C-alpha cells in the first residue's frame, strides 16, 4: 500500500496531493466562500440553506459528512463552512488520532460552534470512534483517569460544535458513525466547463495569461478533478513562460500537455500501458488481475486503487466475473476496430458486470 500511495503521488494526473508544497499551493487558490465555489451546485445549494438556518438560530451547524473521489474539494468545503459560520476550524485526519486522548484533547479545546474537520474519517480506530459517539450526540465525552483498580471514568461537557468528516470510501464507515451525520453530501466529478472556470480563476490568482480555449484544453485533460486541473495549469504556465512569452492558448496548452504525456482524455503513460496490454496481449480481454499485473509490471493494488477507478468511471474498462475487458471506447481511443459481437473476443467484451 505504501508503494501504491507513492506511485499515485508521482503521477501528474493523480488526484492526491503530491507534496506538502502542493498543499500550500492549493491553499493559496482555495475559494473562501460559497459564492466563489465552482461546481457541486446541489451540495452548495443545500449548504447555503443549512448554514443560514443555523446562523439565524444561533446554533452550530449539524454534523456534515462529505464523501467522493479525492481532489474534488472536500477540504475546501470544510474551510468554507467554518468561514461562513464565522467560527474557527480545527483540522486533523483519521490516521493521526491514534488514541482516545488525542481526540479528547481536540474536543475539549473547541470553542462554541467551532468546526472540527477530520479528513479520512474512515480510518479512525474503533477506540477513538467510540469516544466520538457521545461527543456528537450529547456534546460530552467519557475519559478514563488513572490505571488499574484506581481507574475511574470522568464525564466532561463540551462546547457545541460541528464535525465535518471527509472520506473517499464512505462504504468503510461504520453504521453508527454514519448515522450521526445530519448532513451527508456526495461530491461528483466536474465537467469541462466547470473546470475551465476553475482554471481561469486560478490563472488570475497566479497572474498567468490564459485565454478561454487554453483553459478549456487544460480542463478537458483534468479527469474531472480541480486538483489535477490546478496542477496541470502550473506546468502549462511554466511551459508558456519559456516557449510562448507567458501566453497560454489552446495550442500552447496542447503542446505542454503532450510534453507531459497527458493525452486529450487525460490518460498518462500508465493508463495507456494498461489498456494497450489488454488490447494487444490479451485480445481485448477478459484477463485476470494477476495476469494483467504481471504483463505490465505493476502491483495488483496499484492497478485496483490507482489505475482502474478512472478508466472504469469513464467507460474505458469493464470488470466482469472472468476478468478485465476493454470497451468500445477503448478500441476507438486507440484507433482500432472492435471485434465483432459474435466473435470469441467480442463475447466477453460486450458482457455487463455481474453476468
Swiss-Prot record:
GO molecular function, one term: ATP hydrolysis activity
Head domain (RuvB-H): annotated segments: 264-355
Region (Large ATPase domain (RuvB-L)): 4-190
Residues that bind DNA: 300, 319, 324
Keyword Hydrolase assigned: yes
Main enzyme class: hydrolase
UniProt keyword list: ATP-binding, Cytoplasm, DNA damage, DNA recombination, DNA repair, DNA-binding, Hydrolase, Nucleotide-binding
Regions annotated as coiled coil: none
Domain of life: Bacteria
Principal subcellular localization: cytoplasm
Enzyme Commission identifier(s): 3.6.4.-
Disruption phenotype: Slight increase in sensitivity to trichloroethylene vapor, UV light or mitomycin C.
Lipid biosynthesis found in the keyword field: no
Binding-site list for ATP: 29-30, 71, 74-76, 137-139, 180, 190, 227
Domain remark text: Has 3 domains, the large (RuvB-L) and small ATPase (RuvB-S) domains and the C-terminal head (RuvB-H) domain. The head domain binds DNA, while the ATPase domains jointly bind ATP, ADP or are empty depending on the state of the subunit in the translocation cycle. During a single DNA translocation step the structure of each domain remains the same, but their relative positions change.
Family, similarity comment: Belongs to the RuvB family.
Function: The RuvA-RuvB-RuvC complex processes Holliday junction (HJ) DNA during genetic recombination and DNA repair, while the RuvA-RuvB complex plays an important role in the rescue of blocked DNA replication forks via replication fork reversal (RFR). RuvA specifically binds to HJ cruciform DNA, conferring on it an open structure. The RuvB hexamer acts as an ATP-dependent pump, pulling dsDNA into and through the RuvAB complex. RuvB forms 2 homohexamers on either side of HJ DNA bound by 1 or 2 RuvA tetramers; 4 subunits per hexamer contact DNA at a time.
Subunit structure: Homohexamer. Forms an RuvA(8)-RuvB(12)-Holliday junction (HJ) complex. HJ DNA is sandwiched between 2 RuvA tetramers; dsDNA enters through RuvA and exits via RuvB. An RuvB hexamer assembles on each DNA strand where it exits the tetramer. Each RuvB hexamer is contacted by two RuvA subunits (via domain III) on 2 adjacent RuvB subunits; this complex drives branch migration. In the full resolvosome a probable DNA-RuvA(4)-RuvB(12)-RuvC(2) complex forms which resolves the HJ.
Protein name (Swiss-Prot/TrEMBL): Holliday junction branch migration complex subunit RuvB
Organism in which the protein naturally occurs: Burkholderia cepacia
Gene name of the encoded protein: ruvB
Amino acid at each position: 500500500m505504501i508503494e501504491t500511495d507513492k506511485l499515485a503521488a508521482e503521477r501528474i494526473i493523480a488526484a492526491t496531493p503530491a507534496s506538502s508544497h502542493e498543499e500550500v499551493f492549493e491553499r493559496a487558490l482555495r475559494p473562501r466562500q460559497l459564492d466563489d465555489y465552482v461546481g457541486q451546485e446541489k451540495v452548495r445549494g443545500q449548504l447555503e440553506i443549512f448554514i443560514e438556518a443555523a446562523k439565524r438560530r444561533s446554533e452550530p451547524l449539524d454534523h456534515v459528512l462529505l464523501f467522493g473521489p479525492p481532489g474534488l474539494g472536500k477540504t475546501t468545503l470544510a474551510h468554507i463552512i467554518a468561514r461562513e459560520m464565522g467560527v474557527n476550524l480545527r483540522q486533523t485526519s483519521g490516521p493521526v488520532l491514534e488514541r482516545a486522548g488525542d481526540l479528547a484533547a481536540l474536543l475539549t479545546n473547541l470553542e462554541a460552534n467551532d468546526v472540527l474537520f477530520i479528513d479520512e474519517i474512515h480510518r479512525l480506530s474503533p477506540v477513538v470512534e467510540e469516544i466520538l459517539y457521545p461527543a456528537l450526540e450529547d456534546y460530552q465525552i467519557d475519559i478514563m483517569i488513572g490505571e488499574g483498580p484506581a481507574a475511574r471514568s470522568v464525564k466532561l461537557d463540551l462546547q457545541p460544535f460541528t464535525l465535518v468528516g471527509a472520506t473517499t470510501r464512505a462504504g468503510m464507515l461504520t453504521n453508527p458513525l454514519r448515522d450521526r451525520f445530519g448532513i451527508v453530501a456526495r461530491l461528483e466529478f466536474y465537467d469541462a466547463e466547470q473546470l475551465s472556470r476553475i482554471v481561469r480563476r486560478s490563472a488570475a490568482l497566479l497572474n498567468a495569461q490564459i485565454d478561454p480555449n487554453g483553459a478549456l484544453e487544460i480542463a478537458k485533460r483534468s479527469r474531472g478533478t480541480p486538483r489535477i486541473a490546478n496542477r496541470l495549469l502550473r506546468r502549462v504556465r511554466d511551459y508558456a513562460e519559456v516557449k510562448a512569452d507567458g501566453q497560454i492558448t489552446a495550442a500552447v496548452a496542447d503542446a505542454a500537455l503532450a510534453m507531459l504525456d497527458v493525452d486529450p482524455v487525460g490518460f498518462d503513460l500508465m493508463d495507456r500501458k494498461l489498456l494497450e496490454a489488454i488490447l494487444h496481449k490479451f485480445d481485448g480481454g477478459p484477463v485476470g488481475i494477476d495476469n494483467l499485473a504481471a504483463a505490465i509490471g505493476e502491483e495488483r493494488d496499484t492497478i485496483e486503487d490507482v489505475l482502474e477507478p478512472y478508466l472504469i468511471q469513464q467507460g474505458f474498462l469493464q470488470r466482469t466475473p472472468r476478468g478485465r475487458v476493454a470497451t468500445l471506447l477503448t478500441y476507438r481511443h486507440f484507433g482500432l476496430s472492435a471485434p465483432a459481437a459474435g466473435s470469441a473476443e467480442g463475447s466477453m467484451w460486450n458482457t455487463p458486470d455481474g453476468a
